[in-house]
Amino acid sequence: MKISARDIDHLSLTLTEPEAAATRLQQLGFNLTPEGVEPRCICFQPDQDDVPNYVELLQGEPPVTALALNVTELEGEERTHAWETEDGFEVDAGVVVGESGGPLPWFAVRHETPDAFMEPEWIVHPNGALALMAVHAVAEKPKEVAKALKEAWSAKVEEVFDGCMLVKTGTVELLIWSPDAYQSEYKAIEAMAPQDLPAIVGVTIAIERARPLQALLRANNVPFALAEGDRVLTSPEQSGGVMIEFLPQN
């Protein structure tokens, strides 16, 4: 399956217990869309008005983490749901979802109502989170996976260094690490590559400042580690199944 991807639209986490993951993510200082309506989403201010920027939590078996790629034209399954804001205003969301692809789990999406993921009360977070900047994956052969995705998405590919490939279609980056490079880069949280590869393992979230986030995590008894560049790292166990790298912008 080949597409002309505009950007990585969102990260989709299919979990056995999404509400447990939502609770952990709230302890990290994220706002989520209202409980009781699937999916629960962590939404951010997007770079483009018609390309949302978010993470979604879905209930399902087996658990899988997949990338959603935004396209302008797509035929597929139409999914609709409605959330209610705190002031009682109903927000309707409609998304057309295409077939799954590989070698990393991914699928194409076309938004009927992109504004639904940009409500002001959902894109402001107590931890100062601003945007989903990057997604991290691990593969035995990063170059081969990057090459396959370049062809599938009409993407640009760059070798950052030996053991790390960058795949880019828009604003949000995909970094594909070798197991050794990933474990070395994120050794502060004792990161371990999954057994089944390739796999998506984490995200980079832009935040305003590091110190308020650190104070919030300490107050909520959430373990974290610090890395070069004032980055704040939380392990998958603390953050709903994915490693989170918080990158301060100030």
Regions inferred by a protein language model and the residue ranges of each:
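Fe(II)/2-oxoglutarate oxygenase catalytic core
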Residues: 38-41
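Glyoxalase I/VOC metalloenzyme domain signal
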Residues: 1-9, 13-33, 43-250
